Structure formats: C-alpha cells, structure tokens
Amino acid sequence: PLTKDAIDAAKGADLIISVTREILQKYALYKVPKHLINHGVSEDFLKQYPVSKFDNDVIHVGFSGNLMRPDIDRNVLLTIIEYHPAIIFECWGSYKEKDGNIGGAADKPTNAFINSLVAAPNVILHGAVFTAELAAGLQQMDAFLICYDIKKDQSKGTNYHKIMEYLATGKVIISNNVTAYADRADLILMPEERDNNNKLPELFSKTIRNIAAYNSNANQHTRKQFASKNRYTRQIEAIAHFL
C-alpha cells in the first residue's frame, strides 16, 4: 500500500515515473501520465578499467550491497559459497554495524551470518568503498550473484539498481527472480520461482560450469550495450521528453 507521503506526492503530481511496473500499478487511480524508466548507471561503471587479476584460472564472483540487510537469503548464499570452495566470492558493502546504512542491524542472526562470511576461506570482504573503487573492482569479476529473499526484500524482487552496474561489466549475472528482467535471459539468469530460492544454487552451478559460453564476446556486448543505453544522461533526456 502507498504511504501517506506517497499519496500526498501523487495528488500534486503531473507525471509519475518509476523503475518498476509494480509501483506504477499502485498509482493506477491517479489520472496522470505514468512512465517506466529503468535504473540508470553512472559513467564510472561504463568506463573500462585495466584487468588486474593475477589468478586468471580462478573464477571470481562479485556481490555488492549492505551485507547486514535482513532480506539477504543468507542460507542460500552461504550454501552456494560452501559448495564452491574453488571460487572466490568478493563482496563490497557494509559488514560492520558502524559502517552500516539503512536496512542493517547487528542482531544475533546477522552476526552469525557475517561471522560465517569472515570465516569462509573463499570470501573476500572489501567493505564499503567509494564508487570508482567499486566500479574498478566489479570489472575484475567473472560473474555476479544476487541473492535476496523476495518475501523480505523491500522491493519484492522487482528491480535492483546494482543490476545495471553489473551489466556494465558484460559478465553473467545469476540472481533470485527479478520481475523487471523476467523476459531477458540474455541479461540475467534467474529461477522462475517467486516464493523461494531453492533452485538458485543449481542454477549457479550450471552457469559456472558453462561460464565461457555465458561470457562470450557476443553475450558481453549485449549486456554492455543495454547498460550503456541506460546511462544517467540518457535517462535524464528521456525524463525531459516526458515533461
């Protein structure tokens, strides 16, 4: 349901723009133009950085976001990490309460989860970093993992800003179900299920076994082009066109 602030904003709006169809549907009763625009991506992520990996025979999988958030599907994420000891999982984002932002708290389950990540020999925790450092780090990855519990997720698995940042690298993305990309298997691989991530570990394993094909030059080009078409400057131009 819409909050009071959202209702008040809609009453005075001449135009409603959102990154998800689901949000636009909530405003169906308001008779003003409505437009869907995807998340944008900054030039930092579209820039090409030199590859600095020294272990090219080892697969590196990236994950970015506040690791203290309760809507991460922690059991599934830890299962995937445990089942793939030869893969390095690099995580960017807060994992200490003092560095956290909205949506994270150091309760017992969260501490247990973070401790498991810290103890895992194939996990690297970079913590919160500046945008340019994150962008450069993501470009070193071979694949990306998104693993949220849709039932707890504040966006309910509709769209995530980080997807565009991952797409900008061209590398394959394995994710929980995301409605905004439900018909774009060329951009993101995801299970069909919306109520659980039970099939995500197997999808991850299958993708990694065939990572060369998923990261072919053609596939990488498709992902990069999609991200480039959603750069912030183009999104601003699109919004200006609606006004």
Where on the chain are the PLM-derived regions?
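A charged, aromatic-enriched C-terminal amphipathic alpha-helix characteristic of glycosyltransferases
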Residues: 195, 202, 212-243
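Membrane-proximal helix-turn-helix segments that form the acceptor-binding/catalytic region
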Residues: 1-16
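Acidic anion/phosphate-binding donor-loop and adjacent secondary structure
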Residues: 28-29, 41-57
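Conserved donor-binding/catalytic core segment of Leloir-type glycosyltransferases
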Residues: 17, 54-72, 77-81, 89-92, ...
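Nucleotide-sugar-dependent
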Residues: 132-137, 145-167, 174-185
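Nucleotide-activated donor-binding/catalytic signature segment of Leloir-type glycosyltransferases, i.e.
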Residues: 93, 103-138
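Carbohydrate-associated surface elements
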Residues: 22, 37-43
